[in-house]
Amino acid sequence: MLFRSIDYRLAPEAPFPAAFDDCKDVVKWLVHHADHWNIDPNNLSIAGESAGGALAVSCGLSEVGKYLKLVIPIYGALDVCSASDLDYWDYDLYDVIPEHKKYVITRLNRFRNLNGTLQNLYLNDISDAKNPMASPLYATDLSNLSNVLMIEAEYDYFRLSNDLFAEHLWNADIPCEVIRYQGMDHGFYDRLGYCEQTKDCILEIAKHIK
């Protein structure tokens, strides 16, 4: 099994769609060099964490999606629109006991209060906020996606957009499995050795891409 890590360009030096274009180009390169690497060009998987999760989904939505048998967003940042503009986002949709609520709100606000800043840093044009290649949640054509494994963290700001995207996939009869790690926050995938959930997440991904 061959693994490749994509060193895509980063904003603000290289705003949207630079990172997306880089990821697509790598998929195309792997397909065109499949014989050299002894891989099946129609049996590729793509995964990413946070912004990388959104890029993975965007690739699945694009013309290279036909080569991707599995797309794995790990708490993907699937919507870069400002929270104040979102009718689906609400603190009350996070189930938490009252004495812990202030801690959860503090964690959620790390991204909720940054969304306008993220738009300014990531996008060339604010009108791209709902471009499906920047915010996959707003995609209307899901036909290039064949299978999705969605990893969620219970107290992640982006969880609600992930939940909504999963519903869109199910409504379109696209296979989508959601694994939500209870009690976890955005970034838990980096805590191998500290969180058992991280180890379980890695094993689940390995099981799905075999």
Task: Label each PLM-derived region with a short phrase.
Residues F3-K210:
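Alpha/beta-hydrolase superfamily serine-hydrolase fold, recognizing
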